């Protein structure tokens, strides 16, 4: 689950980069769709489900994984295509990212409890930065930023890159820590 979501983030970023070079609206639309997917469902639902494999021993079937992605893609299509949801989208994105942040806080606590204080602190810090980016995204303009939002994207992309990297190492730390997902040894 995590790998597929990270692939979607890479596709979104790659398409946005190519759009910035070519001004192709098709590339922008692809990037916009994948960005909406990740903000609304990819991180808050799919990434949490993936992280739950080391916090709760959650192992969904291939069919459940596929169903989760199909439902998330369908819901993203509604978010992107239906004009009636436009006024609520920024608030929905912020709510969903906040759900993800709450789970990352729990994940950091689990790391701390497992004796992985460095990973716990790193994950908590990138969670705070990610929550700040999610709050700024649709609601605030950074003073001095240009019409292309260059400063915002430098901060956002740097934060997301650090978040993905820290999440990978945090996941591995809990996975290596033990096979008992609740931390209760026999």
Per-region residue spans from a language model:
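Membrane-proximal helix-loop-helix units in multi-pass membrane proteins
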Residues: 40-113
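Hydrophobic alpha-helical transmembrane segments of multi-pass membrane proteins
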Residues: 2-21, 34-41, 95, 125-139, 154-158
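C-terminal transmembrane-bundle signature of multipass membrane proteins
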Residues: 47, 108-186
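Membrane-interface segments at the starts/ends of alpha-helical transmembrane spans
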Residues: 28-31, 75-82, 145-154
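Membrane-interfacial loop-to-transmembrane alpha-helix junctions, especially the N-terminal start
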Residues: 1-8, 58-69, 116-126, 181-185
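Helix-loop junctions on the outward
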Residues: 12-38, 84-87, 142
